[in-house]
Amino acid sequence: MSINWVTYKEGSESDILLLENECMFDCFDGVAISILCKPPSLKSWTCTKGLLCLTNQRLVYIAKDTDCDFKDFQSPVANLKDTKLNQPFFGANYYSGTVMPVPNGGIPCEAEVKLQFNEGGIFNFVEAWNRLIQRFQEVDSVSRVQHLDPLPPYHRPSSSQDQPPHYEEAVNKS
């Protein structure tokens, strides 16, 4: 079963097919994932080992453990909210956040997602994630720029009294 299905390159079950204008940032092996839907739906999915790939458009998880509840999962970057790095006193560091559902996806409502980096690499992931989020924010802020009022139309002065000093000299030189 796939959650928000992932398309693979032909003949491979770990090499994801990138979307148009999508590029791979980094991949992290040995990552555990748990997805817990918020009430009213109490669906949940877990996997203890898999490959996590971060692209410029989405987060993709491919399960490598045969005992997992699902085969793969993906979420658009914009659908992951309230993300944070967690460093428990005991256990591996993990990254958590809220994933918003996509139309016709496998997640029925908002869900808590937890990515546990059992084989290291979380700080590289956090650095790549923060760069990606910063780019999203820059693009968003550019699209919301307040434009100034248009400049008034230019009208040629009607008399020499309305012209700035030395205007005639400058016009005659050119």
UniProtKB/Swiss-Prot annotation:
One of its GO terms (cellular component) is cytosol. InterPro entries: WBP2-like (IPR044852). It is found in: Cytoplasm; Nucleus. One of its GO terms (molecular function) is chromatin DNA binding. GO terms for biological process: positive regulation of DNA-templated transcription; positive regulation of transcription by RNA polymerase II. The keyword Nucleus applies. Residues 165-174 have a biased composition (Basic and acidic residues). Keywords: Cytoplasm, Nucleus. Signal peptide: none annotated. Residues 147-174 are annotated as: Disordered. Induction: By stress. Belongs to the UPF0664 family. This is UPF0664 stress-induced protein C29B12.11c.
